[in-house]
């Protein structure tokens, strides 16, 4: 029988609390680097944990802890359609957007959910072909060259991360057919800037809102409608597509749009990049060939994540290491650095994925817990960050574990040789140097020049940042977050913390009398500017 116990009630966690971290200065060897390396999806995308502060003793306890907490069994419950999201009484079905792994999942005793997601994807493929061929044109008969996605949170961050990761790869392979843009913030300057930078006559718009009444998305959609009308595009709906729930206000009220692609309430926004939320824009911009590779990489990782052996399951191992670092070593943040400009938006998606999922203070049964949960997730792009916050990481008083991401080859295949090495070789050399410097440090009698080392890191790497690779990496982090939530005994699939601010904002906008003196005082400072 599957048990749902708090982390501090698990016997093997109590054992783990007494285990000191490995000393990287002496432990990090060529042999260790070779041995502490596994593939994320069973093929070409690797997770190397040689520079983590763990050894074989930790790995043994990790295995026992995973078994005791029934982590793989809980993952199987997700795949088989159990209502894991207990606070909202919902299933968690994002894995089904990339393939059938568990049992058939039937919703409301009639609809096969894998077939539902696949049928929506086929609709996207067919729609994109019609757009690319010119059979579907703009109101003024122009062929669409641009796609603008309007949405916020999971309706923007994940899709934007995938778009920027793949854009140059698609260009190099002559698969970049349309330009993608995103509008998320309710700040009208963002909408104005994006819409003024493109030819509206050649632009298709995707409106994404699961509920259909997201404040920011509704406001930005109205901004768009006003802009289109003022530019002579009166039949604006002929340039709009909608992604939402079947019975949402958006689906019911905004009739007559070009096409409707449907989400399902079993998939939260942060887990939705491989649903219509992310794949509609990606298919339009880069063709279904690219999208199928993303799905393939994610699906293979999903399958390999079923492996009970911790040393062969990268997301599971990464989750256990994360719990050890947060709850035993007391490291409060995790920095994600991709040595690839194309992945500049990826850590922003991971911020939401991890912090919205596991930033909780009650367990699955709505009981307050007395141990740490999620770490602060932040990051950037190497080598830029070496000249900004790496000083703090090397010599600051806080130890911050890092995830490095790197690739052997570039996407565009253009480079230059200077000082006997290419720019890409310099990029990779800096990545390697940082891992070693953080691990081993460098002793100096001058304390200002002394580097203590013992800064742990993991390395995710592959030959090239391909659609397949980004799909595998995306799934790796999604499953890692899921396993962390299981260990912490929390519900990783709701987000009540988002709601309070929304409620207060609506009260402020509607309450002209300002009966609350705190609201009144702030409103006079910011809204009224008295």
UniProtKB/Swiss-Prot annotation:
Signal peptide: none annotated. It comes from the Bacteria. GO terms for cellular component: cytosol. It is an enzyme of class 5 (isomerase). InterPro entries: G6P_Isomerase (IPR001672), G6P_Isomerase_C (IPR023096), Phosphoglucose_isomerase_CS (IPR018189), SIS_dom_sf (IPR046348), SIS_PGI_1 (IPR035476), SIS_PGI_2 (IPR035482). The active site is at 356 (proton donor), 387, 502. It is found in: Cytoplasm. Its EC number is 5.3.1.9. It catalyses: alpha-D-glucose 6-phosphate = beta-D-fructose 6-phosphate. Pfam families: PGI (PF00342). Its main location: cytoplasm. One of its GO terms (biological process) is glycolytic process. Keywords: Cytoplasm, Gluconeogenesis, Glycolysis, Isomerase. GO terms for molecular function: carbohydrate derivative binding; glucose-6-phosphate isomerase activity; monosaccharide binding. SUPFAM superfamilies: SIS domain. Catalyzes the reversible isomerization of glucose-6-phosphate to fructose-6-phosphate. HAMAP family: G6P_isomerase. This is Glucose-6-phosphate isomerase. The lineage of its organism: Bacteria, Pseudomonadati, Spirochaetota, Spirochaetia, Spirochaetales.
């Amino acid at each position: 029988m599957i048990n749902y116990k708090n982390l501090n009630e698990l016997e093997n966690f109590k054992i783990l609390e007494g285990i000191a971290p490995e000393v990287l200065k002496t432990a990090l060897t060529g042999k260790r680097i070779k041995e502490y390396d596994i593939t994320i999806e069973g093929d070409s995308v690797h997770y190397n944990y040689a520079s983590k502060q763990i050894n074989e003793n930790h790995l043994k306890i990790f295995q026992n802890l995973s078994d005791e907490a029934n982590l793989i069994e809980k993952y199987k419950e997700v795949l088989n359609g159990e209502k894991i999201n207990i606070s909202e009484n919902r299933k968690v079905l994002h894995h089904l957007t990339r393939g059938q792994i568990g049992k058939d999942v039937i919703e409301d005793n009639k609809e096969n959910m894998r077939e539902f997601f696949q049928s929506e994807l086929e609709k996207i493929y067919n729609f994109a072909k019609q757009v690319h061929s010119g059979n579907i044109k703009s109101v003024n008969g122009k062929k669409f060259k641009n796609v603008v996605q309007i949405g916020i949170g999971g309706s923007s961050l994940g899709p934007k991360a995938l778009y920027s990761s793949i854009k140059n790869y698609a260009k190099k392979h002559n698969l970049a057919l349309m330009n993608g843009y995103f509008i998320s913030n309710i700040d009208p300057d963002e909408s104005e800037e994006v819409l003024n930078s493109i030819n509206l006559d050649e632009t298709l718009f995707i409106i994404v809102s699961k509920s259909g009444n997201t404040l920011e998305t509704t406001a930005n959609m109205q901004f768009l409608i006003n802009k289109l009308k003022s530019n002579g595009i009166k039949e604006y709906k002929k340039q709009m597509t909608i992604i939402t729930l079947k019975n949402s206000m958006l689906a019911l009220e905004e009739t007559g749009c070009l096409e409707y692609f449907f989400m399902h309430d079993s998939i939260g926004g942060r887990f939705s990049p491989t649903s219509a939320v992310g794949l509609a824009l990606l298919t339009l911009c880069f063709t279904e060939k690219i999208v199928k590779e993303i799905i393939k990489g994610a699906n293979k990782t999903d399958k390999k994540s079923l492996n009970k052996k911790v040393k062969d399951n990268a997301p599971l191992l990464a989750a256990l290491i994360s719990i050890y670092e947060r709850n035993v070593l007391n490291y409060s943040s995790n920095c994600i650095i991709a040595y690839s400009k194309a992945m500049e938006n990826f850590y922003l998606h991971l911020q939401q994925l991890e912090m919205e999922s596991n930033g909780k203070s009650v367990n699955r049964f709505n009981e307050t817990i007395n141990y740490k949960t999620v770490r602060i997730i932040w990051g950037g792009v190497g080598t830029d960050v070496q000249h900004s916050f790496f000083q703090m990481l090397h010599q600051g008083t806080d130890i911050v574990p890092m995830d490095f991401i790197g690739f052997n080859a570039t996407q565009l295949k253009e480079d230059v040789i200077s000082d006997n090495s290419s720019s890409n070789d310099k990029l990779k050399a800096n990545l390697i140097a940082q891992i070693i410097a953080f691990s081993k440090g460098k002793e100096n009698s001058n304390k200002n020049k002394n580097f203590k080392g013992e800064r742990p890191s993991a390395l995710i790497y592959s030959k090239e940042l391909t659609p397949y690779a980004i799909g595998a990496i995306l799934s790796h982090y999604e499953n890692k977050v899921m396993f962390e939530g299981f260990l912490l005994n929390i519900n990783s699939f709701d987000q009540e913390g988002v709601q309070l601010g929304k409620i207060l904002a609506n009260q402020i906008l509607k309450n002209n009398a300002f009966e609350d003196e705190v609201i009144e005082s702030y409103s006079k400072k910011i809204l009224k500017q008295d």
